[in-house]
Regions:
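Alpha/beta-hydrolase superfamily serine-hydrolase fold, recognizing
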Residues: 1-197
């Protein structure tokens, strides 16, 4: 799906774009003989962050309200999150630059502030089963590892596929080069996970 990009908008606009697209897909299922019980969401990098939050909003009304977003009226059965940019306010390259563009200058004083931490219990506990993919050469590998720990602590069914050091397996490699052997392995493992939830 397409969504507006920062700095032309804030993250709340992006959440709305994703939620609206999900709603449109759900409403269009009958045209394509889709099964409303078998809807999964897959995204990478910043899109994985947006998908995670909008999906959590379907089960966490305070999050949706704080984000000024009307969430989809249905739940995704599971998520596939590839090289997710889950953390936006840490003391790192992302956290030092993005927060004021994403959330606005005074976001720490808003109702959304507690949710800027992707490990927020209300947020994480509202997620469906998650399949995570990363690699040692992914610059956001540590984000995936920390988010996987949060899923474990909140008893969210999940699976992590972490590829070893390999200079070809960089950030979101399975999206940028889906025909690599490792990309096929990741995609097939995600498919198998989806079949079991």
């Amino acid at each position: 799906i397409e969504y507006r990009l920062v700095p032309d908008c804030q993250v709340y606009d992006q959440f709305t774009d994703v939620a609206d697209a999900m709603t449109h897909i759900f409403q269009s299922l009958s045209k394509f003989q889709g099964d409303s019980e078998q809807i999964y969401g897959v995204a990478d990098s910043g899109g994985a962050y947006l998908l995670t939050y909008v999906t959590a909003m379907t089960g966490c009304r305070p999050l949706a309200k704080a984000a000024h977003t009307t969430p989809p009226s249905f739940r995704l059965r599971a998520l596939g999150l590839i090289s997710g940019m889950f953390y936006t306010t840490r003391f790192d390259k992302i956290g030092l630059v993005l927060p004021r563009y994403l959330y606005g200058k005074h976001y720490k004083k808003t109702p959304f502030a507690p949710f800027t931490n992707a490990e927020n219990k209300d947020l994480v506990s509202s997620l469906p089963p998650c399949f995570l993919v990363s690699s040692h050469n992914d610059n956001l590998e540590h984000y995936t590892l920390h988010f996987e720990k949060a899923l474990s602590e909140n008893h969210i069914p999940h699976k992590l596929v972490l590829f070893p050091q390999n200079k070809r397996l960089t950030h979101a490699f399975s999206v940028f080069d889906p025909f690599m052997k490792e990309s096929t392995e990741a995609i097939m493992a995600m498919h198998q996970f989806f079949e079991t939830v």
